[in-house]
């Protein structure tokens, strides 16, 4: 997630709420939600493919930014990370280099928008995030293409 999201470590109540959301999304049937570092400021919510776990971080909470990713609720954020895990289980290996990492992020947000228990506002934010990620991919791919031609 982006730095325009929350950076303050989560309280025990917020962590418990996220654990309940994870169960609601049926994430516990896919992989473990690791909460041990979520109380640390600046911690990141992310799927770790090597360990097949989602780490809960401070940035699971929305921030003050105007971008859809900044405004995503805990449900949308966790659904996005769960979709990375589900896609990994389907055999989709995540790219780590630009520009393709942007497409992976777009696909994860679109996939997450179809998960059960994701409401309309969250769905819109996830779709808007996917659009933004595709635009970032287009810019990065064009830059890479221009560099290769030089």
Task: Annotate each predicted stretch with a short phrase.
Residues 101, 113-150:
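Long, well-structured alpha-helical subdomains associated
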Residues 1-40, 145, 149:
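A metal-dependent hydrolase signature that marks the N-terminal structural subdomain at the beginning
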Residues 82-99:
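Catalytic Zn2+-binding segment of zinc metalloproteases
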Residues 34-75, 85-89:
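Active-site scaffold of zinc-dependent metalloenzymes
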Residues 6-11, 65-68, 97-99:
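Second-shell loop/turn segments in exported
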Residues 85, 89, 111-118:
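Active-site catalytic microenvironments for nucleophilic, acid-base chemistry
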Residues 73, 77, 103, 107-111:
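Extracytoplasmic/secreted proteins, especially bacterial periplasmic and envelope-associated proteins
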């Amino acid at each position: 997630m982006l730095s325009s999201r929350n950076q303050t470590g989560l309280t025990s109540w917020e962590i418990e709420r996220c654990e309940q959301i994870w169960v609601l999304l049926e994430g516990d049937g896919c992989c473990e939600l690791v909460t041990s570092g979520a109380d640390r400021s600046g911690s990141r919510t992310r799927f770790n493919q090597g360990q097949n776990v989602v780490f809960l971080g401070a940035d699971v909470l929305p921030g003050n930014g105007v971008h859809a990713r900044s405004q995503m609720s805990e449900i949308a954020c966790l659904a996005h990370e769960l979709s990375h895990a589900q896609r990994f289980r389907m055999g989709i290996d995540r790219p780590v280099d630009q520009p393709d990492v942007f497409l992976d992020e777009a696909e994860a947000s679109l996939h997450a928008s179809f998960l059960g228990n994701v409401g309309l506002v969250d769905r819109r934010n996830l779709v808007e995030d996917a659009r933004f990620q595709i635009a970032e991919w287009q810019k990065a791919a064009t830059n890479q293409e221009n560099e290769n031609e030089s």
